[in-house]
Amino acid sequence: MSEIVPPEVRPKPAVPAKPSHVAPPSSAPFVPSPQGTGGEGQGSGRGSALLGYIGIDTIIEQMRKKTMKAGFDFNIMVVGQSGLGKSTLVNTLFKSQVSRRSTSWSRDEKIPKTVEIKSVSHVIEEGGVKMKLTVVDTPGFGDQINNDNCWEPISKHINEQYEKFLKEEVNIARKKRIPDTRVHCCLYFISPTGHSLRQLDIEFMKHLSRVVNIIPVIAKSDTLTPEEKTEFKQRVRKELEVCGIECYPQKEFDEDMEDKSDNDKIRETMPFAVVGSDKEYQVNGKRVLGRKTAWGVVEVENPNHCEFSLLRDFMIRSHLQDLKEVTHNIHYETYRAKRLNDNGGLHPISSSGHDTQESNL
């Protein structure tokens, strides 16, 4: 009889020890816990030191490079009566001839019976960043004896740009980058009467502040004394408040206390009392943009003379991206929701087809 050999006894694999504490699921991003700081489970959570450099902060540089390569669109509309220096101010803001210069009507010419919409686009490059700037002018606004509802063509144009963007969004063969012709900012020029807003001013801002970012400015403010300017600005702010008109930046869209603090200062400054000029003068050994008067040169960028630099810094240097975001996230989304609700939704549009539904806005 053969000898029975007992089966070989193999060592059992080690069973990992059950953790003494199981952390609940968290939506916080994973952060490695530091080594050598104590017992198990310590050093986890937000604010813990990283073991080494990861590189997540390079996302800012990545975004910057993509923006510089692609560029961006910025569309500004100027509205106001003829002769208030709309084109000059826009050209001064962007330091180039970007706006068509309005011409004064001669006796032989007829003033347009309705408001016209004319736009011109330019590509501006600064520091490697390209911006396609489109300036939308509205000749004929407020120039009639009867100006009833003269804001309607402007409102129609703004909504048409929302409609154009919406149709591109629902297109089956949607472009990788949808051309953006939506109006991001409307500069509304108030005549420097020194008295109060006209009914036309109130009606325009009341209707248009619902669909576009309005920034009111007092044109040719050098025609007012400092005292008249201060009183006029206070009166305009009071009238806007009484009429329930909220210009940009609207209080309800302040994201945090820092935003609120910064925007409150801007709201207290509005309307901006501005002067525009494309002419240079020698002042104290320096070349400055300004307007020559009997009392001297009004320097455009001197904050003691006017608020042009405040307007420029606000509109371009601190709030340009926010103007675009409020346009997309608030005004356009409001239009989009109403459009879809009123028409039972939009069906996708093929590259060869057309959506026959028209906007009721």
Curated annotation (Swiss-Prot):
Residues 219-222 are annotated as: G4 motif. One of its GO terms (biological process) is cytoskeleton-dependent cytokinesis. InterPro entries: G_SEPTIN_dom (IPR030379), P-loop_NTPase (IPR027417), Septin (IPR016491), Septin3 (IPR008114). Residues 80-87 are annotated as: G1 motif. It is found in: Cytoplasm. GTP binds at residues 80-87, 114, 220-228, 276, 291. Residues 15-34 have a biased composition (Low complexity). Keywords: Cytoplasm, GTP-binding, Nucleotide-binding. Residues 70-342 form the Septin-type G domain. Residues 36-46 have a biased composition (Gly residues). Residues 349-361 have a biased composition (Polar residues). This is Neuronal-specific septin-3. It comes from Danio rerio.
